[in-house]
A protein has these predicted regions:
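N-terminal pre-domain/capping segments
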Residues: 1-88, 114, 121, 153, ...
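Surface-exposed, active-site-proximal loop segments in enzymatic domains
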Residues: 66-78, 94-107
C-alpha cells in the first residue's frame, strides 16, 4: 500500500512535536525521522518520539540515519531505529561517487553494507540505501551492480541533473527493492 508521508528533515528547524502537528493538519500518515536533527543516536529521544508519533495515530516509516558505510559501529544507529519502531533504516553508500572509488574501496563498502543488512535483519529492520550523488548509488550502473552484490533495498529520489527519461528508467530498475520514493 502506498501512503503519503513526510521526511522530518524537510523541517530541520522544527521540533518533532511541531512536525507531528503539521502532519496531522496535512493528513499525512507516516514519517521518516531524520537522525541528524530530530533523533540523534544516543540522545535517548527515540522512544519519546515514537510514543508521541504513535500517540497521534501516525507511524514511523523509516529512520533516516545518515550513517555512511565507512563509519564504524552500525549498532547505535540500529538501536535508534528499533526504539523508534522503524521498519527501515536509511543509510548512505559512502562518501565518494562510484567513479571515484577503486575496487578495494568498493569491496570494503559492499562488505560493510552486507554486514549492516545482516545486523538489521536480525532485528527485523530493512537497510535501504539512499539514491544520492557522491555515493555508490550515483549511477544506474553502480546501483545495478549493488543489486547483484547485496540484498539491500533503496530509498529512491530523482536526480535533478538527469533527464526525465533517465530518472524514470532508474526508478523502474529499483522497483523490486524499493522501500521509499522521496519527492521534492
Amino acid at each position: 500500500m502506498n501512503r503519503a508521508g513526510l521526511v522530518s528533515i524537510t523541517f530541520r528547524n522544527k521540533t518533532p512535536r511541531e512536525i507531528v502537528a503539521l502532519m496531522k493538519r496535512a493528513g499525512l500518515s507516516q514519517v521518516e525521522w531524520g537522525g541528524d536533527v530530530h533523533v540523534k543516536p544516543g540522545a535517548e529521544s527515540a522512544a519519546e518520539v515514537r510514543r508521541m508519533t504513535e500517540g497521534e495515530g501516525l507511524r514511523t516509516s523509516a529512520y533516516g540515519s545518515y550513517y555512511r558505510l565507512e563509519e564504524n559501529a552500525f549498532g547505535p544507529w540500529l538501536d535508534e531505529a528499533e526504539a523508534l519502531g522503524a521498519p527501515v533504516i536509511r543509510v548512505w553508500a559512502g562518501r565518494k561517487g562510484s567513479a571515484e572509488v577503486d575496487e578495494w574501496e568498493r569491496e570494503t563498502l559492499v562488505h560493510t553494507l552486507n554486514d549492516c543488512v545482516r545486523q538489521a535483519a536480525e532485528r527485523n529492520i530493512v537497510v535501504s540505501l539512499e539514491y544520492h550523488p557522491n555515493t555508490l548509488t550515483d549511477s544506474r550502473d553502480s546501483v545495478r551492480r549493488l543489486m547483484r552484490e547485496s540484498e539491500t533495498s533503496f530509498h529512491w529520489q530523482p536526480r535533478w541533473d538527469w533527464p526525465e527519461e533517465e530518472r524514470l528508467a532508474a526508478l523502474k530498475e529499483v522497483v523490486p527493492r524499493l522501500t521509499c520514493v522521496h519527492t521534492f
